[in-house]
């Protein structure tokens, strides 16, 4: 009996026309049956947002051999939910978000719509991977990341991932990658996040900006260190965010009324 091709579901938060998504498609062609359900425009920073206040629609963009592309009016997470409910003929073997224009290392994982895609796939019990490049520009060069994306995806298809675990993969913006480092999430936070301006007609407005404050710049096991030294940063990420080490401490607090 002929072996079934892997089923691969893709989405992103930069929109269906983003170069990163289309480079991801190019890099994965031939690996299986690819279905894309991506937002119809940029949804960066959408995290795990879902749409509940109005209907969501989707439209077919193009269809080729082993590739069908749809665009969706909702969020990145809406895209995954809707694709699984409508256009995916069988359970995907892998859900992939990316390639994101901009890294999703450290605390960015909490804001990222690309990682929202990945976490939604993970919540559904599907092996899921997020790919991001440390370059926000629309014409970013993704070419050096594609061989690694293909290899990592092959390995996930071969081995699978444990329930509740996904991969957050970030690439430095360099043509000369030094290899792969298995990393943990860097401890840090965004500071000076708003730029204030005065409107010519009166009043003020703000643009979100900011600087990343790395609490541990010398931590060689962290994703920021790996990226800063030319390595691909692979961070296994879990959806259970329970702080188990704090549970016994809290039992000693006087929380009853």
Feature annotation, model-predicted:
Residues 11, 37-39, 97-100, 131-132, ...:
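Short beta-strand segments
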Residues 103-112:
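Glycine/threonine-rich flexible loop motifs
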Residues 143-257:
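Electrostatically charged, flexible surface regions
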Residues 94:
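Short, Asp-centered acidic motifs that coordinate Mg2+ and/or phosphate
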Residues 2-11, 19-86, 90-91:
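A cross-family phosphate/adenosyl-ligand binding-site feature
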């Amino acid at each position: 009996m002929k072996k079934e091709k892997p089923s691969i579901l893709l989405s992103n938060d930069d929109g269906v026309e983003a170069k990163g998504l289309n480079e991801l498609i190019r890099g994965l062609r031939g690996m299986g049956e690819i279905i894309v359900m991506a937002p119809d425009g940029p949804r960066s920073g959408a995290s795990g947002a879902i749409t509940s206040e109005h209907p969501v629609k989707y439209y077919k963009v193009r269809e080729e051999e082993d590739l069908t592309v749809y665009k969706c009016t909702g969020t990145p997470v809406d895209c995954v939910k809707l694709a699984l409910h409508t256009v995916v003929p069988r359970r995907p073997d892998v859900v992939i978000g990316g390639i994101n224009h901009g890294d999703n290392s450290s605390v960015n994982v909490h804001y990222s719509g690309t990682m929202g895609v990945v976490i939604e796939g993970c919540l559904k019990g599907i092996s899921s991977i997020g790919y991001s490049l440390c370059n926000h520009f629309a014409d970013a060069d993704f070419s050096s990341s594609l061989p690694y994306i293909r290899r990592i995806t092959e390995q996930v298809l071969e081995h699978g991932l444990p329930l509740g675990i996904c991969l957050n993969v970030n690439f430095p913006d360099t043509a000369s990658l030094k290899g792969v480092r298995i990393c943990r999430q860097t401890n840090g936070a965004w500071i000076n996040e708003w730029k204030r301006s005065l409107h010519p007609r009166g009043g003020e407005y703000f643009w979100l900006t900011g600087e990343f404050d790395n609490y541990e710049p010398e931590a060689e096991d962290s994703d920021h260190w790996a990226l800063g030294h030319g390595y691909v940063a692979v961070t296994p990420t879990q959806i259970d965010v329970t702080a188990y080490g704090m549970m016994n401490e809290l039992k000693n607090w006087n929380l009853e009324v």
